[in-house]
């Protein structure tokens, strides 16, 4: 009987604890934890990107020199004639990433891909 009471008091004290570094466990007990595939994650520190759990501050390259945050943005390759450009677009919460309709964050780089070799006289 004494171990049950001790365990109940311990859990009550743990839930009522206001010590730093301890998150409010009552919030986690009342709400289902978000899932990424079969894994749960902490949305205050992580996100689920295409079935992979990432840290919120993780970055990736878009093109050769432009960084973006995959938790909040996605990288798109767009072509205009013979030029390709990488564009970072916002991810719209609750919607699947779409390179055509998502708002543009920034245009990263343009790369020229000529259909035929360019001679020096073409540039002058």
Swiss-Prot record:
Keyword presence, Signal: yes
Glycosylated sites: 57, 84
InterPro entries: IGFL
MF GO annotations: signaling receptor binding
CC annotations in GO: extracellular space
Subcellular localization(s) per the UniProt record: Secreted
PANTHER family attached to this UniProt entry: INSULIN GROWTH FACTOR-LIKE FAMILY MEMBER 3-RELATED, INSULIN GROWTH FACTOR-LIKE FAMILY MEMBER 4
Protein known as: Insulin growth factor-like family member 4
Originating species: Homo sapiens (Human)
Gene of this entry: IGFL4
